Amino acid sequence: MMGQNQTSISDFLLLGLPIQPEQQNLCYALFLAMYLTTLLGNLLIIVLIRLDSHLHTPMYLFLSNLSFSDLCFSSVTIPKLLQNMQNQDPSIPYADCLTQMYFFLLFGDLESFLLVAMAYDRYVAICFALHYTAIMSPMLCLSLVALSWVLTTFHAMLHTLLMARLCFCADNVIPHFFCDMSALLKLACSDTRVNEWVIFIMGGLIVVIPFLLILGSYARIVSSILKVPSSKGICKAFSTCGSHLSVVSLFYGTVIGLYLCPSANSSTLKETVMAMMYTVVTPMLNPFIYSLRNGDMKGALSRVIHQKKTFFSL
């Protein structure tokens, strides 16, 4: 496993989470429950939007893609974490490590772009309500989703190819629970300046600019709803925006703090906790915040259940 270049390294070792042995089973059960909640919650959203014609709108098109992204985002890291906790085998093959990094970047970036699309959809719905249908046409919505997939695929592939050209020498221990890009760069024994510059530049395009666009959209929304005379309408709009912004702040806050503004004395434990927030907690909370508390989603669930009961009663 030791060697002078990347071809001699057959695998990496994931240190995982700093958990005491006596807490291992409890943490395993907790993460398994959180992962299953994420899967079931996001799958429920996707199925309901697919089955109920009332939800075939731009907002729920973006939401179904966001749920798919959350589902895949968690599936990139959590199953491997659970496997390592159960088998006590921290190794991950070199190719699998780069593959995990690729899909981690892909679905993480995809969520960033979809959050922008959702913010824009709500901006148009509130600020240009009379022209909403004309502006948010099916072609525009599909184009926004397709563009999100294309850009994130390119970005993830770029970082993966740049990582694959690096040399890894003696140290193959990753102090994380997944193949984190910044952790891999610290293990490289070749020049990583190109990688670091690409992370800084592309990070601004992929993370910071979408975050600013979301803030700009909601600033316009707040400005618009303050002019609405109905206090009920204002409360409803603020409630919707508040839920969305809470998840946006959680996701972008940890990502920006971890990758774009790292502190010189940041500990591995702190980085791991921050990573757990946006890889495990946020995808689990999204179904509850975005949909399961939504009246349209509850109505769709009721209609689907009623249709099933009617079908089986025939």
UniProtKB/Swiss-Prot annotation:
Main location per the UniProt record: membrane
MF terms in GO: G protein-coupled receptor activity; olfactory receptor activity
Sugar attachment sites: 5
Disulphide-bonded residues: 97-189
CDD domains found in the cross-reference section: 7tmA_OR1E-like (cd15236)
Protein localization: Cell membrane
Swiss-Prot/TrEMBL keywords: Cell membrane, Disulfide bond, G-protein coupled receptor, Glycoprotein, Membrane, Olfaction, Receptor, Sensory transduction, Transducer, Transmembrane, Transmembrane helix
A GO cellular component annotation in the UniProt record: plasma membrane
Extracellular-facing ranges: 1-25, 80-100, 159-195, 260-272
Highest taxon of the lineage: Eukaryota
BP-aspect Gene Ontology terms: signal transduction
Chain ranges passing through the membrane: 26-49, 58-79, 101-120, 140-158, 196-219, 237-259, 273-292
UniProt cross-references to Gene3D superfamilies, sorted A to Z: Rhodopsin 7-helix transmembrane proteins
InterPro entries: GPCR_Rhodpsn, GPCR_Rhodpsn_7TM, Olfact_rcpt
Membrane protein topology class: Multi-pass membrane protein
Segments in the Cytoplasmic topological domain: 50-57, 121-139, 220-236, 293-314
Family named by the database record: Belongs to the G-protein coupled receptor 1 family.
Its job: Odorant receptor.
Protein name: Olfactory receptor 1E1
Organism: Gorilla gorilla gorilla (Western lowland gorilla)
Lineage: Eukaryota, Metazoa, Chordata, Craniata, Vertebrata
Gene designation per UniProt: OR1E1
